[in-house]
Amino acid sequence: MTEKKYIVALDQGTTSSRAVVMDHDANIISVSQREFEQIYPKPGWVEHDPMEIWATQSSTLVEVLAKADISSDQIAAIGITNQRETTIVWEKETGKPIYNAIVWQCRRTAEICEHLKRDGLEDYIRSNTGLVLDPYFSGTKVKWILDHVEGSHERARRGELLFGTVDTWLIWKMTQGRVHVTDYTNASRTMLFNIHTLDWDDKMLEVLDIPREMLPEVRRSSEVYGQTNIGGKGGTRIPISGIAGDQQAALFGQLCVKEGMAKNTYGTGCFMLMNTGEKAVKSENGLLTTIACGPTGEVNYALEGAVFMAGASIQWLRDEMKLINDAYDSEYFATKVQNTNGVYVVPAFTGLGAPYWDPYARGAIFGLTRGVNANHIIRATLESIAYQTRDVLEAMQADSGIRLHALRVDGGAVANNFLMQFQSDILGTRVERPEVREVTALGAAYLAGLAVGFWQNLDELQEKAVIEREFRPGIETTERNYRYAGWKKAVKRAMAWEEHDE
């Protein structure tokens, strides 16, 4: 009998490194997770130690195989998914980082972005990289490291230094420095990559003074990049054959591989991505244009919108307002009332993200009357997550001209049946919740497995995409539009709160 084979997904996130073993039926066999230190040298600055990222990720790989009691020769392939935009520069000769990893959340390069704005580069960046000019992305982070570590510009030009996002760093370490690659999804988050020519953008490299010599080769999201012999019993060299940034991996894990398919991840905030097929749609409505994975890991495009406050607004109810003891309680209290009694909560605690991009908006509660109680406010806070999702979806439909027929959902808050039903009601579309909630790891596993023939094609995977529950709209169009109009009015009044009158 042939020995049973498995796929390992490495999921390198912002606060922890995880490894997940899956079998051919996409069942999760074992999981290992290790947290690592968040470094805050100054307000608004966020760093990670690249060696700690590597140590935690490599140890979870060993642990996850031991937990499942399988040897490395039973692993058909490894797939990698990662926190996007986080930037690492290291020495080619020694493999030592020349500075800590600058994390996607870090705002230290705001001044560099202001200079680029003054130089009139905003439109060029949006048109060619698909991104908005913001410290979020890798390009200005690389420049900052080269500007602040003595001698590094010259060393980079001599080919002595290498740059990579987290996927690139992990593969470099796993292959003992033999392979320096990234995939199209991660490259598209650097602000250095032209999403139309599918090559590094010479103008952006020149503007930021980043030598091409230090950049990784950009490859498809599903192919064999190299092999590793790290991890567990047995000495087999395991192919590394899938890479995707975390949100694109979730999109693929949800099998949103056709034009017009979309997923929303409900975490601290919300990330919604819609696959736009072979067409890069330039957003006129505050969204990002990014690269996603097609059916065999080839380049597709997507529109992406980020909402800042989703699960975080439930935490606010619990930690600051003390209205609930546990996030799970929110559903119970929300369903104790029939509606919000006219109340709208706009959770703009740190401003508003897509599609408004208003850093001066602030949180507000509107429509308070004498009959309003705590349950109404809890319900209105949950509803705000669904309203913000509709805001992003309306922008996506306006940009793409595509009408969404079903939204696939994942993340912690999807366990809340009230929220999922209201999401369906307010969108006027089906909401599909999958049985397997580990969709980010699943996406990386699928990409890796397809590359080595572990799964033959996407049709085989469609059978495994079991929808645990489907939510369908339960309110009339007039009621839906009336409620949404109230939300829009509330948002308008919360905007520009911090701005002072001239």
UniProtKB/Swiss-Prot annotation:
<dbReference type="InterPro" id="IPR043129">
    <property type="entry name" value="ATPase_NBD"/>
</dbReference>
<dbReference type="GO" id="GO:0004370">
    <property type="term" value="F:glycerol kinase activity"/>
</dbReference>
<dbReference type="GO" id="GO:0019563">
    <property type="term" value="P:glycerol catabolic process"/>
</dbReference>
<comment type="pathway">
    <text>Polyol metabolism; glycerol degradation via glycerol kinase pathway; sn-glycerol 3-phosphate from glycerol: step 1/1.</text>
</comment>
<feature type="binding site">
    <location>
        <position position="14"/>
    </location>
    <ligand>
        <name>ADP</name>
    </ligand>
</feature>
<comment type="function">
    <text>Key enzyme in the regulation of glycerol uptake and metabolism. Catalyzes the phosphorylation of glycerol to yield sn-glycerol 3-phosphate.</text>
</comment>
<feature type="binding site">
    <location>
        <position position="412"/>
    </location>
    <ligand>
        <name>ATP</name>
    </ligand>
</feature>
<dbReference type="InterPro" id="IPR000577">
    <property type="entry name" value="Carb_kinase_FGGY"/>
</dbReference>
<keyword id="KW-0021">Allosteric enzyme</keyword>
<feature type="binding site">
    <location>
        <position position="84"/>
    </location>
    <ligand>
        <name>glycerol</name>
    </ligand>
</feature>
<feature type="binding site">
    <location>
        <position position="84"/>
    </location>
    <ligand>
        <name>sn-glycerol 3-phosphate</name>
    </ligand>
</feature>
<feature type="binding site">
    <location>
        <position position="14"/>
    </location>
    <ligand>
        <name>sn-glycerol 3-phosphate</name>
    </ligand>
</feature>
<keyword id="KW-0808">Transferase</keyword>
<dbReference type="InterPro" id="IPR018483">
    <property type="entry name" value="Carb_kinase_FGGY_CS"/>
</dbReference>
<feature type="binding site">
    <location>
        <position position="268"/>
    </location>
    <ligand>
        <name>ATP</name>
    </ligand>
</feature>
<protein>
    <recommendedName>
        <fullName>Glycerol kinase</fullName>
        <ecNumber>2.7.1.30</ecNumber>
    </recommendedName>
</protein>
<feature type="binding site">
    <location>
        <position position="18"/>
    </location>
    <ligand>
        <name>ADP</name>
    </ligand>
</feature>
<feature type="binding site">
    <location>
        <position position="416"/>
    </location>
    <ligand>
        <name>ADP</name>
    </ligand>
</feature>
<comment type="subunit">
    <text>Homotetramer and homodimer (in equilibrium). Heterodimer with EIIA-Glc. Binds 1 zinc ion per glycerol kinase EIIA-Glc dimer. The zinc ion is important for dimerization.</text>
</comment>
<keyword id="KW-0479">Metal-binding</keyword>
<dbReference type="InterPro" id="IPR018484">
    <property type="entry name" value="FGGY_N"/>
</dbReference>
<keyword id="KW-0862">Zinc</keyword>
<feature type="binding site">
    <location>
        <position position="268"/>
    </location>
    <ligand>
        <name>ADP</name>
    </ligand>
</feature>
<dbReference type="InterPro" id="IPR005999">
    <property type="entry name" value="Glycerol_kin"/>
</dbReference>
<feature type="binding site">
    <location>
        <position position="14"/>
    </location>
    <ligand>
        <name>ATP</name>
    </ligand>
</feature>
<dbReference type="Pfam" id="PF00370">
    <property type="entry name" value="FGGY_N"/>
</dbReference>
<keyword id="KW-0319">Glycerol metabolism</keyword>
<comment type="similarity">
    <text>Belongs to the FGGY kinase family.</text>
</comment>
<feature type="binding site">
    <location>
        <position position="16"/>
    </location>
    <ligand>
        <name>ATP</name>
    </ligand>
</feature>
<dbReference type="InterPro" id="IPR018485">
    <property type="entry name" value="FGGY_C"/>
</dbReference>
<feature type="binding site">
    <location>
        <position position="315"/>
    </location>
    <ligand>
        <name>ATP</name>
    </ligand>
</feature>
<dbReference type="GO" id="GO:0046872">
    <property type="term" value="F:metal ion binding"/>
</dbReference>
<dbReference type="Pfam" id="PF02782">
    <property type="entry name" value="FGGY_C"/>
</dbReference>
<dbReference type="GO" id="GO:0006072">
    <property type="term" value="P:glycerol-3-phosphate metabolic process"/>
</dbReference>
<feature type="binding site">
    <location>
        <position position="311"/>
    </location>
    <ligand>
        <name>ADP</name>
    </ligand>
</feature>
<keyword id="KW-0418">Kinase</keyword>
<feature type="binding site">
    <location>
        <position position="246"/>
    </location>
    <ligand>
        <name>glycerol</name>
    </ligand>
</feature>
<feature type="binding site">
    <location>
        <position position="85"/>
    </location>
    <ligand>
        <name>sn-glycerol 3-phosphate</name>
    </ligand>
</feature>
<feature type="binding site">
    <location>
        <position position="246"/>
    </location>
    <ligand>
        <name>sn-glycerol 3-phosphate</name>
    </ligand>
</feature>
<dbReference type="GO" id="GO:0005829">
    <property type="term" value="C:cytosol"/>
</dbReference>
<keyword id="KW-0067">ATP-binding</keyword>
<feature type="binding site">
    <location>
        <position position="311"/>
    </location>
    <ligand>
        <name>ATP</name>
    </ligand>
</feature>
